[in-house]
UniProtKB/Swiss-Prot annotation:
It comes from Opitutus terrae (strain DSM 11246 / JCM 15787 / PB90-1). The keyword Nucleotide-binding applies. Homodimer. PANTHER family: TYROSINE--TRNA LIGASE, MITOCHONDRIAL (PTHR11766:SF0), TYROSYL-TRNA SYNTHETASE (PTHR11766). One of its GO terms (biological process) is tyrosyl-tRNA aminoacylation. Catalyzes the attachment of tyrosine to tRNA(Tyr) in a two-step reaction: tyrosine is first activated by ATP to form Tyr-AMP and then transferred to the acceptor end of tRNA(Tyr). This is Tyrosine--tRNA ligase. A motif ('KMSKS' region) lies at residues 231-235. The keyword RNA-binding applies. Residues 358-424 form the S4 RNA-binding domain.
Length: 425
């Protein structure tokens, strides 16, 4: 299977400036390609995985990938896919974000490959030395304003209430210049990106044709969306980031394990390196036994391992088991706090657990797991109450400080999934 065959099977092909010519060129040998990542935040997010993993897919097929960190373009802001002007970042913010993003890019590509090592560049290194007048003469001269206004990214903003500034209007010239520079200095013939980058990419192929008379291609992938058409990559608490400080590995894992049945096979194709045979088998299993959620677990395991590594993925799976009655032995306090972060929490004075401890029936009422002590006794007698995920057998049971997790937490559960954390203050 060629790289283009693989992309098409995975649903990663949207458009190409000249598919027949690119197919022929790829058949002649390895090409150098690039994709840009602007430092709009200090971490990449789930949506960035599509182009980033595409670079890796090309590398696995023997091609030469370049990851471009947008130290220059990040100072301007891309209008593509935006309904309003971006807030300009300060040079210090851009520098901080670039440093963080470069570190993340380095985890997904092989920079030590023997025959086709990946490379990383920062467009500020060749953009910063150019004067404004030089840029207007050497780049701006080759662009028709009429053609720029016809680009979807510009036209959509012109039709919006906020309009578009000259700063963002000029963004496509900067990206076009990047492609030209890489074509001249690194023989980069292909730029890849999401469909919202089509206008910027074709600006680059046009500039290369006019300035160099040399071939260059653009290839785009569909935006990562759910079955209902909305963008994929956000949880109820916001964007899902690759940086563990912004989205913990546990929450990252949970985001994917909760994928809808209608989305999971598509996500397996787009966000993992599982083979067609493996994904087809998971699809068959999903249709036969959707309740097992084997496809979702495979997705979460594959993507979490890819982004955070084997150890963090194993920890995330272990933590997930807590919410399904798993034991708490060996769980760290930070992991416990992450898991129970969205569980209702009730505070309790430490004195209540002193001496012989507090009656469990009273704690259940305090925690909101029972309306009365009488109902709490019935629930305990019925085998439906758990303390730290261990079933309680006697309604007369008391809870003491010795049972506190990390000296300050008590995990109470009613039934299979109704939890409350009691925090000692």
């Amino acid at each position: 299977m060629t790289i283009l065959d693989d992309l098409q099977w995975r649903g990663l092909y949207a458009d190409c400036t000249d598919l027949a010519a690119l197919t022929q060129r790829l058949g002649q040998g390895p090409v150098t390609l690039y994709c840009g990542f602007d430092p709009t935040a200090d971490s990449l997010h789930v949506g960035n995985l599509v182009p980033l993993l595409a670079l890796r897919r090309f590398q696995l097929h023997g091609h030469h990938p370049i990851a471009l960190a947008g130290g220059a373009t990040g100072m301007v802001g891309d209008p593509s896919g935006r309904s309003a002007e971006r807030n300009l970042l300060t040079p210090d913010q851009v520098a901080h974000n670039i440093a963080s993003i470069k570190q993340q890019l380095g985890r997904f590509l092989d920079f030590d490959a023997t025959t086709n090592p990946a490379r990383m560049v920062d467009n500020s290194t060749w953009t910063a030395p150019i004067s404004f007048l030089e840029f207007l003469r050497d780049v701006g001269k080759h662009f028709s304003v009429n053609a720029m206004l016809a680009k979807e990214s510009v036209r959509a903003r012109l039709e919006s209430e906020s309009g578009i500034s000259y700063t963002e209007f000029s963004y496509m010239l900067l990206q076009a210049h990047d492609f030209l520079h890489l074509r001249e200095t690194m023989n980069c013939e292909l730029q890849v990106g999401a469909t919202d980058q089509w206008g910027n990419i074709t600006a680059g192929t046009d500039l290369i044709r006019k300035k160099l008379g040399a071939p260059a291609w653009g290839l785009t992938f569909p935006l990562l969306t759910k079955s209902d058409g909305t963008k994929y990559g956000k949880s109820t608490s916001g964007a899902v980031y690759l940086d563990p400080k912004r989205t913990t590995p546990y929450r990252f894992y949970q985001f994917f394990v909760q994928a809808e049945d209608a989305d999971v096979i598509k996500l397996l194709k787009v966000l993992t390196f599982l083979s067609a045979e493996e994904i087809t088998a998971l699809d068959t299993d999903l249709k036969a036994n959707p309740g097992a959620r084997a496809a979702q677990k495979a997705l979460a395991r594959a993507v979490t391992t890819l982004v955070h590594g084997d150890t963090e993925c194993a920890n995330a799976i272990r933590a997930s088991e807590i919410m399904f009655g798993g034991g708490l032995d060996g769980i760290s306090e930070s992991l416990f706090q992450d898991v129970v972060g969205e569980i209702p929490t009730k505070e309790l004075e430490a004195a209540k657990l002193s001496g012989a401890g507090a009656p469990l029936v009273e704690l259940l009422v305090h925690a909101g797991l029972a309306p009365s002590k009488g109902q709490a006794r019935k629930d305990i007698d019925g085998g439906g109450i758990y303390v730290n995920n261990a079933r309680v057998g006697e309604a007369s049971r008391a809870v003491t400080t010795g049972e506190l997790l990390f000296g300050k937490y008590l995990l109470l559960r009613k039934g299979k999934r109704t939890y409350t954390v009691v925090k000692i203050v």
